[in-house]
Amino acid sequence: MRLSRYFLPILRETPKEAEIVSHRLMLRAGMIRQEAAGIYAWLPLGLRVLNRVVEVIRAEQDRSGAIELLMPTIQSAELWRESGRYEAYGKEMLRIRDRHEREMLFGPTNEEMITAIFRSAVRSYKDLPKSLYHIQWKFRDEVRPRFGTMRSREFLMKDAYSFDLDEAGARHAYNKMFVAYLRTFARLGLKAIPMRAETGPIGGNLSHEFIILAQTGESEVYCDRAYLDFPIPPGSTDFDDVAALQATVDHWTSRYAATSEMHEPERFAAVPEEARMAARGIEVGHIFYFGTKYSEPMGARVTGPDGQERPVHMGSYGIGPSRLVAAIIEASHDEAGIVWPDAVAPFDVGLLNLKTGDIATDAACARIQEQLEAAGLSVLYDDRDERPGAKFATADLIGLPWQVIVGPKGLAEGQVELKRRATGERETVAPDALAARLRRGAAG
């Protein structure tokens, strides 16, 4: 993609309304545009990142055995009355009426709808377990939306729901998502720590929030520093191995970690002083086991092996991709701009032509772009008629993992410059060797 033909409305000045780094950089880098309080348009660069985040989430959900579907944003109020949450949910829920005066709502979550879908199709324990997920936009009318997409009113969510015959099966489903979340966040370049958390309006008696540490975090968190060095479950993890998954979850919950709502000062004081960590954190995922809270009142029942009907046990598992984009920036930036992890960068390579209009550099850049794209790399080619300094600033601001810098002097020597955005390291490479070098760098 040539930058001269791309839509990238970069801002030179930091918007006054942006309070935290991610909000400032997303606006400056032309990723988003505010349309109303807590409501944002995702511009092309931002949408590419959002889509790549979703790809990682989807891959790990599929790996865990969850099955994707898509539910509508508009829901019937009657479903929520069945569960008893319609009146209890509060003003965060956007309530509407259609032309026939039927009460509807813009879904803030989907427990009721997924339960209705399940109960209409599943009648026997032989059809269990089931784990279903969808990725859909939601709306919650926050009292004070702030921090850009970190705490917006409209946001993208991945919601998964598990259905099991009994608590033991439901705990295994919970453990699957626990491990899938650890892997998801690691692939996104984040170190997430699972912490005991309140269940809130979702309900239930078991819940973990996945927290990344950040100075701009909304929550106070308390944990053992050892979590920062815990190994991530490998790609070879067998999600059907009940004992192995339980051992992984036991390991990841073996030390103290809690949000402020669940904090126990006496237990935290028992952690060795050098290992104690009190910090601020950003919630990037939340999982719940809530038993029969929804299946009982909504009649989601199956016949067990004894011939008796019983309500299914359920869990709910959420990740907010639009929130995650901001969280990744909070965890990975410097004074010059964003530093994207390879897995979610909008383009793999920024190709900088330092003398646009020069026959040699134009031809070399066109050839390099063709070779890199043929090798499966995405390239944003800065072919604008701008000063080199402006091109360097743009490349650093938008944070592409690699910068290929092409100028007349280097070309005369048969070389181009390659810069790694994360470290600032530079090297010279022959143009025809770039694709192999970048593949090697991505693998390493």
UniProtKB/Swiss-Prot annotation:
InterPro entries: aa-tRNA-synt_IIb, aa-tRNA-synth_II, aa-tRNA-synth_II/BPL/LPL, Anticodon-bd, Anticodon-bd_dom_sf, Pro-tRNA-ligase_IIa, Pro-tRNA-synth_IIa_bac-type, Pro-tRNA_synthetase. Its EC number is 6.1.1.15. One of its GO terms (biological process) is prolyl-tRNA aminoacylation. SUPFAM superfamilies: Class II aaRS ABD-related, Class II aaRS and biotin synthetases. One of its GO terms (cellular component) is cytosol. It is an enzyme of class 6 (ligase). It is found in: Cytoplasm. PROSITE patterns: AA_TRNA_LIGASE_II (PS50862). One of its GO terms (molecular function) is proline-tRNA ligase activity. PANTHER family: MITOCHONDRIAL RIBOSOME PROTEIN L39/PROLYL-TRNA LIGASE FAMILY MEMBER (PTHR42753), PROLINE--TRNA LIGASE (PTHR42753:SF2). Catalyzes the attachment of proline to tRNA(Pro) in a two-step reaction: proline is first activated by ATP to form Pro-AMP and then transferred to the acceptor end of tRNA(Pro). Belongs to the class-II aminoacyl-tRNA synthetase family. ProS type 2 subfamily. This is Proline--tRNA ligase. It comes from Methylobacterium sp. (strain 4-46). The lineage of its organism: Bacteria, Pseudomonadati, Pseudomonadota, Alphaproteobacteria, Hyphomicrobiales.
